[in-house]
Structure formats: structure tokens, C-alpha cells
UniProtKB/Swiss-Prot annotation:
InterPro entries: TMEM120A/B. GO terms for molecular function: coenzyme A binding; monoatomic ion channel activity. Signal peptide: none annotated. The chain crosses the membrane at residues 132-151, 158-176, 190-208, 218-239, 270-293, 304-329. One of its GO terms (cellular component) is membrane. Homodimer. The keyword Transmembrane helix applies. The gene is tmem120aa. Multifunctional protein involved in mechanosensation, and plays an essential role in lipid metabolism. May function as a potential ion channel involved in sensing mechanical stimuli. TMEM120A is structurally similar to a lipid-modifying enzyme, ELOVL7, and contains a bound coenzyme A molecule, which suggests it might function as an enzyme in lipid metabolism. This is Transmembrane protein 120A-A. The transmembrane domain (TMD) has structural homology to the very long chain fatty acid elongase 7, ELOVL7, despite low sequence homology between them. Pfam families: TMEM120A-B. It comes from Danio rerio (Zebrafish). Belongs to the TMEM120 family. Residues 1-131, 177-189, 240-269, 330-341 are cytoplasmic.
Amino acid sequence: MLFNPTGLTECLQEWEDLEKDYQQIQDTHRHYKHKLEEVSKLQESCSSSIARQRKKLKDLSESLEECKGAVNPEDVNKIDDIQESIKERPNVFFEMEAFLPKKNGLYLSLVLGNVNVTLLNKQSKFAYKDEYEKFKLYLTVLLLFFSFTCRFLVSYRVVDALFNFLLVWYYCTLTIRESILINNGSKIKGWWVFQHYVSTFLSGVMLTWPDGELYQMFRNQFLSYSMYINFVQFFQYYYQSGCLYRLRALGERHNMDLTVEGFQSWMWRGLTFLLPFLFLGHFFQLYNGITLFQMTQLPEWKEWQVLMCGSTFLVLFMGNFFTTLGVVYHKYMDQDKAKGL
């Protein structure tokens, strides 16, 4: 409970106490700034040391390859051991750099400027990752209900525009947050990040598509697709988050690993039942692309959005389908090799 002085004597005593506290605050803040300067110097020293190590390891690796042909078998084994150790270093450096400031990529530089987005402790990183996952879950549920409303309950172009605007904002926000998470040590496969840029572009084109005969022809199909995709994404989040939790507890996954709108190798154990739902979603994208290209053959076609959306849906299909297929193929190949051993 705060002390409220009443008389002059009490006020003067309170002032003296406040002065002492003020001096203590100044000393603490001065000490804090000094430590920050020390941390900055340590960060610069560590970053430059890692860069120097990388260069020297690269040069050493090339020199060892040249030496292999001119040494005896015993020395070849030594070289192999060194090369194995060299191969492990990039992963260690990656873990170190997750706690060091780094230059933003082109996208983050354009959006945020030269702002340091590296979080310097594990608690902050995990809290940001957890907040990202919750954001995806809440927006997925919202988009599912919004698309259902537009498909079955409301049929106004202005409501469709609000839905598409929400999609643009959602995917834009995802790309920014994912870039920050990558800066902080999350390993997200290239396509699963890039597809969000493609989806942002697609949603933006859908937003600008004027109301007309062709728009109305494609509207219900697009909303049905949106409902299905959001349902699958919710389904994926539910099962992927549980699987990631178990794998982290076993020490088989990194704390900064994320749920994705696709299939990755770590999902092979226990989540293969998701594959039919994913492939159906991929072929839905192909169906949308074909439908839109067929619309360009109609005499009513005059909007550029028809061709652009059709091309974008085909890009999404090819990227999603072949990336997922590649993961499945590599897992089968790995299993065959394991059986052969």
C-alpha cells in the first residue's frame, strides 16, 4: 500500500526517500547501459568469429579434398573424420546465429527497414512462435466461418471484398511473421514460405476482380475451395501441433519448428493419413486453374483477373503437389535404403 504523506515533516521525509530511490535508479540504469554495450561488443565479436570460421573451414575442406589422392589409407581416414566434423559445424553456427543480430532479408528490409528483429533469449523466441501459431489458428477458424457465410448465407460483392481483403492481410502478416521467425532460428522449407507470397498475390487479384457474369460463375467454386482449404489447415494444425510436441519432448525436433500448410518429412510417423486431404486440396487448385482458363474461351471474357487467377492457381498446384510428392518419394527411398542395410 502506498504511503500518503500528510504533514510537512512527512512530506520532506518522503522526498528524501524518493531522492535516494532516484539515485539508485540512475545507478541501475547506468549499469544496464554499460552491460548493453558489452553485449553489443560480444555480439559483433561472435558474428565476425563465426564468419571467419566459415571461410577457414571452406578453405580447409577444399585443401583436404586435394590431399586425399596423395596420402596413405590411414591419413584418408583422418581426413574423412575431419570432413565429417566440418559438415556438422553449419548446424552449430546456425544455432549460435539465432541469438545474434543479423541483417534483415530484402522483404523485411522493405517492410520494416533496418530494425533488429532477433530475440535474444529462448523464452522470447518460443513465446513469439507460440503467438504465431495461435494467430494462424484463430484466423483459420475465422476465415472458415467467413467463407461459409459468403457461400451459403450472404451474396453481396462488398462482403466478398471484405473476405478477400482479410485474406490479403492474413497472408501479408504471415509472410512478415515467418521472416522474423526464420531470423530467430525457425527452419521453414522454401516453398511453404513462398506459397504465402503467391497466396497474397492471388487474394489481391481476387479483391480487384469486378462483379460480373464471370465473377459470379467462379464465386461459389472459389468459396467452396476456401472452406475446404481452411478446414484442412485447421485439421493439420490440430494434429501437427500434437506431433511436434511429442517429438520435441523426445529431443527429435527443434523448439522453433512450426506447423505448415503442407507435408514435411517429420510428419511421416503418425500423420500420413493427412496426405489424401492434402492431395485433394492440390487437385482443387488445379481444377480452379483449369476452370478459369476455360472461362477465357468464353465470349464474355474481358477481365484480366480471370487469366491471372488461373495462372496463380496453377503455380500453387505445381508447387504444392511436387513439393509434397518429393517428400513422399524421399521417405520411401530412405525406407528402402534402411531395409537394404
